[in-house]
Regions:
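Catalytic phosphate/metal-binding cores of nucleic-acid and nucleotide-processing enzymes, i.e., regions
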Residues: 43, 48-50, 74-77, 126
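ATPase catalytic-site recognition across NTP-hydrolyzing enzymes
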Residues: 1-57
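An active-site-proximal beta-strand-loop segment
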Residues: 55-68
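A residue-level signal for conserved active-site and pocket-lining positions in enzyme catalytic cores
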Residues: 21, 157, 196
Length: 200
């Protein structure tokens, strides 16, 4: 039954769930950002130099609507002899109406206290940015350049991943979901996390 399936889903890595139960193994073929380019980080979150939060918001919570997504990234130095790298700190996705989105966004903001907040200037992102500014939170509006489609934006950030500069906390389900979505792009079912990543 559905409850049992939900339990199985919660216990399996996202990749196994997609392959076994959804009959939809995430293929690496054609992937712009490959799974093996991500580095896992064990232990507690390192000292961060800068925290960035990126928002891709949808129009509504209708079944047919896209998801709203928030990812949080930290800039840090993994090892003394290395330059700066990025760490995926958190990822939240859901179908929210505006009041819910505002609460989720504020919770995430208060928890991570990012220095930079980037919100795509579309859909519920516009009023959300206004609300944040009203509270004294500085927001950067993200406007995709004309002629720069999603594909181009992902291609632009791919070298950062390929050069081994992106980390994720080991054994975190949200990290698995983001990695899987990236590996499935551009053929995956969702790309909301991918959108937030290219903005950050």
């Amino acid at each position: 039954d559905l409850e049992e399936l939900e339990k199985v889903k919660a216990s399996l890595p996202v990749r196994n769930w997609s392959a076994q139960y959804m009959q939809d193994p995430t293929s690496e073929e054609g992937a712009i950002i490959k799974r093996e380019w991500w580095n896992s980080w064990e232990g507690k979150i390192p000292k961060l130099k800068h925290v960035i939060q990126s928002y891709d918001t949808a129009y509504s919570k209708k079944e047919t609507a896209d998801y709203s997504a928030i990812t949080t990234w930290g800039v840090f130095t993994p090892y003394e002899d290395q330059g700066d790298a990025l760490m995926l700190l958190d990822a939240v996705r859901g179908k929210f109406d505006f009041p819910e989105l505002k609460l989720v966004a504020l919770d995430s903001y208060k928890y991570w206290e990012p220095e930079s907040v980037i919100i795509e200037a579309k859909a519920t992102g516009v009023p959300l940015a206004q609300e944040f500014r009203r509270m004294g939170i500085p927001v950067v509006d993200f406007m995709p350049s004309r002629g720069k489609d999603k594909h181009s934006r992902v291609n632009a950030v791919a070298p950062v991943f390929e050069s081994g500069q992106v980390y994720y906390p080991k054994d975190e389900k949200f990290a698995e979901e983001v990695i899987e979505e990236c590996a499935a792009f551009p053929h995956g079912e969702n790309d909301d996390y991918v959108d937030t990543m290219t903005q950050a």
